[in-house]
Amino acid sequence: MLVMLTSTLILVLMVLLAVAFLTMVERKTLGYMQLRKGPNVVGFMGLLQPIADGVKLFLKEPVWPTAASPALFIAAPIMALTLALSLWMFIPMPQSISTINLTLLVILAISSLSVYASLGSGWASNSKYALIGALRAVAQTISYEVSLGLILLCLIILTGGFSLQAFIYTQEHTWFLLSSWPLAAMWFVSTLAETNRTPFDLTEGESELVSGFNVEYAGGPFALFFLAEYSNILFMNTLTAIMFLGPLGPNNLNILPIINVMMKATPLIILFLWIRASYPRFRYDQLMHLMWKNFLPLNLALFTLQLSLAVSLGGAGVPQM
């Protein structure tokens, strides 16, 4: 019990530290892509800027609108960060803190619960801009989770199991990125939409909604939403690295698995930042059109194809119930 608590605490601290420096990397990347410096004053080359930002936000007085619902207004960001951090318990590095066989289903279920934090914050703010942003976030998240779920089903047929360890063992000789690149492309775009990142950041369209569902937040509660968002970005890219870029070769679980995953997740995270600097925001109807009229039929077709291939080849790879 004590070992599990210690492992959980270390994991949470490492994730929060990684999130802090991801914000600095993002600001520096955007700065250089826009021909400017970015943060470069606090510490050596601005390395301490995220620490200064965090201290500043948490020292500010938490304020909320007079008409807001205080309990839910404070509970929503806490719930968002708790759900975002709890997802990391299932990442094998090389062993996950929580060892269950239905890892992917639990990850999908916990990520689905994040819509309650968004909706609760928008409703509790008692602001029409926050509520519209929250409703957009809920519709977008639920829509693209359909795509994520179907892609996971296709990959589960190939691995024969619901755990991330099964993905690692299956990719000993070749990556799923090479054999299932259409699924990988749709998965990556869906993770952009799932984490509300550019070009799918309709929930915080500045010209329409000021800042989306967290428009009324300031200080510590706003920082919690910020940490939850970037923790989800790190988690989704780490999950992508494990699912599509699994370690190659025998005995792969013993060869510095954390370094292996980090080396593969880092380019994906940089790609997230590159996309933010390069692409404009979609219209809301284009966002939904992409999911329901493009991704969904293609996912269903690929799922049917892979299921029929697995059955026709003697049931190889089909999960045993």
UniProtKB/Swiss-Prot annotation:
GO terms for molecular function: NADH dehydrogenase (ubiquinone) activity. Keywords: Electron transport, Membrane, Mitochondrion, Mitochondrion inner membrane, NAD, Respiratory chain, Translocase, Transmembrane, Transmembrane helix, Transport, Ubiquinone. It is an enzyme of class 7 (translocase). It is found in: Mitochondrion inner membrane. The keyword Isomerase does not apply. GO terms for cellular component: mitochondrial inner membrane. It is a multi-pass membrane protein. Its EC number is 7.1.1.2. Belongs to the complex I subunit 1 family. HAMAP family: NDH1_NuoH. Core subunit of the mitochondrial membrane respiratory chain NADH dehydrogenase (Complex I) that is believed to belong to the minimal assembly required for catalysis. Complex I functions in the transfer of electrons from NADH to the respiratory chain. The immediate electron acceptor for the enzyme is believed to be ubiquinone. This is NADH-ubiquinone oxidoreductase chain 1. It comes from Lampetra fluviatilis.
